[in-house]
């Protein structure tokens, strides 16, 4: 079906992440897939970075990648995980960039309910679905 899957996880959205894991397990039951887990970290302003310890960025990335590995283990996805990724930047831009670099066949992501701000400004999932070269599976309740 989809041999290479990029799973975009929002660490701040625990219910959405659990739902995404459940759907991934269901898809795994249909056949083997290699999973790449990604959480895009919010970049800090340069003025903040100047005040942080030298290795803060590397430590933050390492901590998030550890969280992704723990997430995979907690949700019985770890046997299929190829790698974890924790870039810092634009959610939609970095998810699409990773999918292209990894030659992903599909991106799985959750969609938050639409509110007025997202309606006016757009959402990450909308940008991913619009701009990705591969299939995008949007998981909802």
Q: What positions do the PLM features span?
A:
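Short, flexible loop segments at boundaries between secondary-structure elements
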Residues: 131-141
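General small-molecule cofactor/ligand-binding pocket signal
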Residues: 36-38, 83-87, 137
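Short secondary-structure boundary segments
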Residues: 39, 110-112, 140-141
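Small/aliphatic-rich secondary-structure junction motif
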Residues: 1-51
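Structural beta-alpha unit
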Residues: 1, 73-107, 114, 126
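A short acidic, glycine-rich active-site loop
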Residues: 54-66
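Glycine-rich, Arg-bearing micro-motifs that act as flexible, cationic patches
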Residues: 109-131
């Amino acid at each position: 079906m989809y041999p290479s899957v990029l799973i975009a996880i929002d660490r701040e959205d625990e219910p959405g992440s659990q739902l995404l894991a459940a759907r991934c397990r269901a898809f795994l039951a249909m056949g083997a897939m290699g999973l790449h887990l990604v959480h895009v970290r919010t970049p800090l302003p340069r003025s903040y970075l100047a005040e942080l310890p030298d290795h803060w960025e590397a430590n933050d990335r390492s901590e998030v990648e550890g969280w992704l590995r723990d997430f995979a283990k907690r949700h019985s996805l770890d046997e299929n995980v190829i790698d974890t990724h924790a870039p810092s930047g634009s959610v939609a831009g970095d998810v699409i960039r990773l999918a292209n670099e990894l030659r992903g066949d599909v991106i799985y992501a959750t969609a938050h309910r639409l509110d007025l701000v997202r309606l006016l400004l757009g959402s990450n999932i909308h940008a991913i679905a619009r701009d990705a070269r591969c299939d995008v599976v949007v998981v909802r309740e």
